[in-house]
Design a protein with these regions (language model features):
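Membrane-interfacial loop-to-helix junctions in multi-pass transporters
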Residues: 1-3, 39-40, 54-63, 94-101, ...
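Signature of multi-pass transmembrane helix bundles
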Residues: 1-62, 219-222
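Membrane-embedded alpha-helical bundles that form the substrate/pore pathway
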Residues: 3, 73, 109-116, 154-157, ...
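Hydrophobic/aromatic residues in alpha-helical transmembrane segments
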Residues: 7, 11, 47-48, 87, ...
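Small-residue-enriched core segments of transmembrane alpha-helices in multipass membrane transport
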Residues: 30-48, 66-73, 141-154, 162-172
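Helix-loop-helix junctions within the multi-pass membrane cores of secondary transporters/permeases
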Residues: 69-151, 206, 219-222
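Transmembrane alpha-helical segments and their short flanking loops
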Residues: 121-222
């Protein structure tokens, strides 16, 4: 009921801030903020797959290549849950058997929100600096840790992590309604790369799960 109305709320807040001249301060740096988020999510995936590849004994970059259809599907539809069929097919190409895929991918689509968490953290920290309210480093760490917990309970749909973390923006970061609306604007400006990172990372988790709990004889990476 709430999430479909979120764009309208953000739109009204943007209009009000635009009339007061606040919006231009943040959106002037919007491209840099989004680019920073994209770079961090890609770096996260490379590290994640290097670790998973070392554990599973597979080429991490070949595994990432096999997961690209899932990445671009989630990027286009902005949803981890809706991309489950494509993510499952891509994970099988990495040599993961059906029983591991059918357990890991649906579960991770609702609890593994790494990309969305990174994106929201970047947006929140950027807004804090751009609005002249930088906070101690310990506050950022506290926010990121609590946000990671909140993301586990968030639905795998567009804006799910954002809605689950609004209370943290106000209670931990001390954001005003205007600052919270700016975070929403940056978060939703290019929502796709968060879910894209989420589903691609699910494949790395499947590699690790298969190593410890899968059958010894598994198909090779295609």
């Amino acid at each position: 009921m709430i999430i479909p109305l979120l764009p309208w709320y953000v739109f009204t807040m943007i209009c009000e801030m635009g009339a007061r001249g606040v919006l231009a301060v943040v959106l002037g740096s919007g491209f840099k903020i989004i680019l920073t988020g994209v770079i961090l999510t890609v770096l996260y995936l490379v590290i994640q797959y290097c670790i998973a590849g070392a554990i599973a004994g597979k080429n991490p970059f070949k595994c990432i290549w096999n997961m690209l259809p899932a990445y671009f599907t989630a990027f286009s539809i902005c949803s981890s849950s809706a991309a489950i069929p494509v993510t499952s097919d891509c994970t099988r190409k990495n040599g993961i058997p059906d029983d591991i895929v059918d357990f890991t991918i649906p579960l991770c689509s609702t609890v593994h929100m790494c990309g969305s968490t990174i994106k929201l953290a970047v947006s929140a920290i950027a807004v804090a600096y751009l609005t002249g309210t930088p906070l101690p480093f310990a506050v950022y760490i506290h926010f990121v840790l609590m946000q990671g917990i909140a993301a586990v309970a968030a639905p795998g749909v567009m804006g799910g992590v954002l809605m689950a973390s609004i209370g943290l923006l106000e209670s931990i970061m001390g954001f005003s309604p205007d600052q919270t609306a700016l975070v929403m604007t940056l978060y939703l400006a290019l929502d796709g790369y968060g879910p894209a990172c989420n589903v691609t990372g699910d494949g790395a988790i499947a590699l690790i799960i298969n190593k410890f709990f899968g059958k010894k004889q598994t198909p090779s990476v295609q």
